[in-house]
């Protein structure tokens, strides 16, 4: 029995990958899950204020993991998982690789976003030399303090929610969701997901992004 459903946002709750337009049918499916007693949590590379707003206005109750795993909110409690990244380091990364900073960087402390989202070997080396982690979600590059990545944040959320791995479902679209999948019992990759994610998923869905969310929730509720 699934008690908690972890859902990624960009590329998963949206109409497709590469758009920020949320799929209304997917939101309705999340509400159906909540009504049936499955709590829904957002697990995303987005910042805390963006996810907290969505969590409350969409009528979710499972809490959230923001900043690509670095920030957790559950039942009124907030928790920082990763080391803080100094502002000068964020600017230096953008300057070195000629990247644009996300408008959400103003609201972040441990994980920062940049575009274009193309991850290069030199960036990984640059981050490693400074004790940092860099990943790409397909929407943005993420530079984070250690441990970085969705896994550590999801472990903390499950602990706060007092939910076991076997009682947890997860759905996502990108490589950055692999770590989230390792912490969940049933995992579903949308049809347009990165091949690396499909390889580790327990279910490869027939439908893309938001339509895939409806498909997965129908499965969980039937
Ligand atoms: O913030 C991003 O780059 C993408 O966010 P996601 O984890 O919801 O796909
Ligand atoms: Mg995504």
Swiss-Prot record:
Substrate binds at residue 150. The keyword Ligase does not apply. Keywords: Carbohydrate metabolism, Hydrolase, Magnesium, Metal-binding. The active site is at 8 (nucleophile). GO terms for molecular function: magnesium ion binding; phosphoglycolate phosphatase activity. Its EC number is 3.1.3.18. It comes from the Archaea. Pfam families: Hydrolase_3. Its cofactor is Mg(2+). It catalyses: 2-phosphoglycolate + H2O = glycolate + phosphate. GO terms for cellular component: cytosol. Mg(2+) binds at residues 8, 10, 173, 177. Catalyzes the dephosphorylation of 2-phosphoglycolate. Belongs to the archaeal SPP-like hydrolase family. NCBIfam families: HAD-SF-IIB, Pglycolate_arch, SPP-subfamily. This is Phosphoglycolate phosphatase. It comes from Metallosphaera sedula (strain ATCC 51363 / DSM 5348 / JCM 9185 / NBRC 15509 / TH2).
